[in-house]
Amino acid sequence: VRDASYIAANMRAEDFREIACLWKHWDTRALGVCAVETAVPGMAWSVWYDGQPAAAFGFSRASAFDPEHWQAWAFGTDRFRRCVPQLTRHVLGFRSRIERDCRRLQVITLKDHDIAHRWIEALGARREGLLRSYGRGGEDFWIYAWVRRHAVTETTGCPGASGQDGRKASWE
């Protein structure tokens, strides 16, 4: 919580514009607590650069009733860009767990945050649509997602998650 709160208090302008517009009352400490406390167990991290916390990122449950539906999040200080290679390697290192435990991983991002869009797309997410007036001030956001394709079971005709019906699911 300490790292995430520090990063939130020293957040770069792009991330502040993207995140603060979602809050009725902006609070950097509350963001740090929310980021860590709502994370999927073991799925919240911070990256330090030059002796200070510089980036926070992770996955939270996007739905209270669907443990396989996750929301990705990341924010950082002005040194965030220097952390992107390490963030990317770290996330890719968890790919097998993400593919196993998560049916849908989504991320929302401010419509004009084009640097974030390029990184998200490079990681393989697909842009699904525009969330009009998603921000409290009328800001539009894009929603991106990675979605696990389920194999259909022969006996029930219902989708089965990877490992539940003996078939391997893939991501798109």
Feature annotation, model-predicted:
Residues 133-172:
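C-terminal "cap" of GNAT-fold acetyltransferases
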Residues 57-66, 131:
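A conserved beta-strand-loop-helix scaffold within acyl/acetyltransferase catalytic domains
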Residues 1-29:
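Short amphipathic alpha-helix that is part of the acyltransferase structural core
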Residues 105-121, 126, 134-135:
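Conserved beta-strand-loop-alpha-helix junction that forms the acyl-donor binding cleft
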Residues 67-81, 86-87, 142:
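Conserved acetyl-CoA binding element of GNAT-fold acetyltransferases
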Residues 41-60:
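Conserved beta-hairpin
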Residues 83-97, 118, 122:
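Conserved acetyl-CoA-binding loop-helix of GNAT-fold acetyltransferases
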Residues 51-56, 67-70, 139:
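Glycine-rich phosphate/pyrophosphate-binding loop shared by adenosine-nucleotide-utilizing enzymes
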